[in-house]
Amino acid sequence: MELTPREKDKLLLFTAALLAERRLARGLKLNYPEAVALISAAVLEGARDGRTVAELMSLGREVIGREQVMDGVPEMLHDVQVEATFPDGTKLVTVHDPIV
């Protein structure tokens, strides 16, 4: 199977998000990379489902809460930027202060 670098990045992100979901299900708190992966994957999947950029910016703030991440992670994570593919092209989605 031949994958482009972009496709490899998306698969790596999905794998990290899957790991984060499993850790959350076991009651563990997420670290910084796991939180970013989970939020990013939610944005990518939302774009695939046909949601708008504005909807995804809002959705990104609802993925995980402060109680689900390790101490200090919300303060370190100010923005998450994801380049998502929409029916009309690729757009940069920025989620401001994703962990509230």
Swiss-Prot record:
GO cellular component, one term: cytoplasm
Chemical reaction(s) catalysed: urea + 2 H2O + H(+) = hydrogencarbonate + 2 NH4(+)
The keyword Cytoplasm appears for this protein: yes
GO molecular function: nickel cation binding; urease activity
Superkingdom assignment: Bacteria
GO biological process: urea catabolic process
EC number in record: 3.5.1.5
Chief location: cytoplasm
Cellular compartment(s): Cytoplasm
Pathway terms, separated by semicolons: Nitrogen metabolism; urea degradation; CO(2) and NH(3) from urea (urease route): step 1/1
InterPro entries assigned: Urease_gamma (IPR012010), Urease_gamma/gamma-beta_su (IPR002026), Urease_gamma_sf (IPR036463), Urease_subunit (IPR050069)
PANTHER family: UREASE
UniProt subunit comment: Heterotrimer of UreA (gamma), UreB (beta) and UreC (alpha) subunits. Three heterotrimers associate to form the active enzyme.
Protein name stated in the entry: Urease subunit gamma
Native source organism of the sequence: Pseudomonas putida (strain W619)
Lineage: Bacteria, Pseudomonadati, Pseudomonadota, Gammaproteobacteria, Pseudomonadales
